Swiss-Prot record:
It comes from Clostridium perfringens. This is Uncharacterized 14.9 kDa protein in nagH 3'region. It is found in: Cell membrane. It holds the Pfam family Phage_holin_4_1. Its main location: membrane. The keyword Ion transport does not apply. InterPro entries: Phage_holin_4_1. GO terms for cellular component: plasma membrane.
Amino acid sequence: MENIINYIKWGIVSLGTLFTWIFGAWDIPLITLLVFIFLDYLTGVIKGCKSKELCSNIGLRGITKKGLILVVLLVAVMLDRLLDNGTWMFRTLIAYFYIMNEGISILENCAALGVPIPEKLKQALKQLNNKK
């Protein structure tokens, strides 16, 4: 039993190390983006359940979209590494872009579920939706 626990620990540490190597440092933009990706998917599933429109195809498209966000983030990381100036300029820029998009989607999902959204956020959503 102890061997199994050690293998699990080793696996978790290995995945964390691999993820850090691929995406760079565990900083606030990266953590925020990952949390927003999870929350957007979760609120989307809840919205689909409530509206009785939950579908595996839609869910798969959502997961694919989230995976492609990570691909774009990886491209930004590679550009930063290519520049070799010790900063995460492109990665941070891409992370902020997707944090904004995922945040808007989370708010839209919450509003569709009947969660009251502050008026200022509603106005910002309307302006951003008009620009799409």
